[in-house]
UniProtKB/Swiss-Prot annotation:
The keyword S-adenosyl-L-methionine does not apply. This is Outer-membrane lipoprotein LolB. It is a lipid-anchor. Plays a critical role in the incorporation of lipoproteins in the outer membrane after they are released by the LolA protein. Belongs to the LolB family. Coiled coil: none annotated. A lipid is attached at residue 18 (N-palmitoyl cysteine). Keywords: Cell outer membrane, Chaperone, Lipoprotein, Membrane, Palmitate, Protein transport, Signal, Transport. The lineage of its organism: Bacteria, Pseudomonadati, Pseudomonadota, Gammaproteobacteria, Pasteurellales.
Length: 209
């Protein structure tokens, strides 16, 4: 299946009746002050996030590029670095696209019977969305858990505010626009990822762990 066909599969699930995530804000609130990475409360928060190993989160995913714009519901189920599933679907269609990680690599399949497995998961992601997106890192990003030695900023609430991540000579900028603050630890509610040409908006509505 060519990249254009994979993108068409995603676009076929566009939520014409529910485009709120595409119109969601992309800027984080202005920092009151920035927290050092060694701050004890921040380190305690990181420890709490690390303890969330097996989880599920549901929400809405929006993709914007110069030539494509679509959104879909998602269901992300994570168990281990080699056992996770991302399912994309729409209320307006029976179409389903699923990405599943296993020992064999990454499998992409749809509700029409197509299935393909690649050991090179980054190459497959390149075909799907046009960039070698690090889906293996996504498991940590959705929790607001940065790489230990990463380039990131922590806000005054001891929440991850933003970070940058290099991929194939491109820099992805991540901004954590909103958090669920009715539970501990605080978990992200709206994340925006941009690389200058593509924007991914991820609204995380329901957490279960």
């Amino acid at each position: 299946m060519k990249k254009s066909t994979l993108l068409f599969s995603l676009m076929a699930m566009a939520l014409s009746g529910c485009n709120s995530v595409l119109n969601a804000p992309i800027e984080v609130k202005k920092l009151v002050y920035q927290i050092e990475h060694t701050d004890p409360a921040w380190q305690q928060h990181l420890k709490q996030l690390a303890e969330i190993k097996n989880y599920e989160v549901k929400g809405q995913f929006g993709y914007i590029s110069p030539t494509e714009r679509f959104s879909a519901h998602f269901d992300w189920q994570y168990k281990t670095p080699i056992d996770f599933t991302l399912a994309l679907s729409s209320n307006l269609s029976t179409k389903l696209l699923k990405l599943q990680r296993s020992h064999q690599g990454l499998t992409v399949s749809d509700s029409e019977g197509y299935s393909r497995t690649e050991a090179d998961i980054h190459a497959l992601m390149q075909e799907i969305i046009g960039v070698s997106f690090p889906i293996d890192q996504f498991a940590y990003w959705v929790k607001g858990q940065p790489a230990q030695e990463g380039n990131y900023i922590v806000n005054e609430k001891r929440q991850l505010s933003q970070f940058s991540y290099p991929i194939n000579q491109q820099i992805w900028q991540a901004r954590y626009v909103e958090y669920h603050e009715n539970r501990v630890p605080y978990l992200p509610k709206l994340i925006v990822l941009e690389n200058g040409q593509q924007t991914l908006k991820i609204r995380l509505d329901h957490w279960n762990y």
